[in-house]
């Protein structure tokens, strides 16, 4: 059973978002997603300054099992990326909701957040897989 923190919002494609004090959102992949993928070997992230559209592929998580596209859960500008993943992609496995975050985005349309899932809704998505 994967850990699904209640304070986060989730996309059905297994990304999570966490609101930060400056109004930006940190994005990563869920513990469930990293369990499915297995040991990470490489993470390709967007560039700081990139403009993302919700639902577009914007990063790649490559594991010993597969390479998986990571989708932007929100539209907006990339403010920061987790440079630690360049040398330590395994942080996604060891701390998916903490040190294994992917990037931060300043949303251009906060209404998109309403279309994301709460923890209960995300659990239902996992249960249907």
Swiss-Prot record:
It comes from the Bacteria. Its cofactor is (R)-lipoate. The keyword ATP-binding does not apply. It holds the Pfam family GCV_H. Binds 1 lipoyl cofactor covalently. InterPro entries: 2-oxoA_DH_lipoyl-BS, Biotin_lipoyl, GCV_H, GCV_H/Fam206, GCV_H_sub, Single_hybrid_motif. Belongs to the GcvH family. This is Glycine cleavage system H protein. It comes from Shewanella sediminis (strain HAW-EB3). The gene is gcvH.
């Amino acid at each position: 059973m994967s850990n699904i923190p209640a304070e986060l919002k989730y996309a059905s494609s297994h990304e999570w978002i966490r609101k930060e004090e400056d109004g930006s959102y940190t994005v990563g992949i869920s513990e469930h997603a990293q369990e499915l993928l297995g040991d990470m070997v490489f993470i390709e992230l967007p560039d700081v300054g990139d403009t993302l559209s919700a639902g577009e592929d914007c990063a790649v998580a490559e594991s010993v099992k597969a390479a998986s596209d990571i989708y932007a859960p929100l539209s907006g500008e990339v403010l920061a990326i987790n440079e630690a993943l360049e040398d330590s992609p395994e942080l996604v496995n060891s701390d998916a909701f903490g040190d294994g975050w992917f990037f931060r985005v300043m949303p251009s349309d906060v209404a998109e957040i309403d279309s994301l899932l709460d923890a209960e809704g995300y659990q239902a998505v996992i249960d249907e897989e």
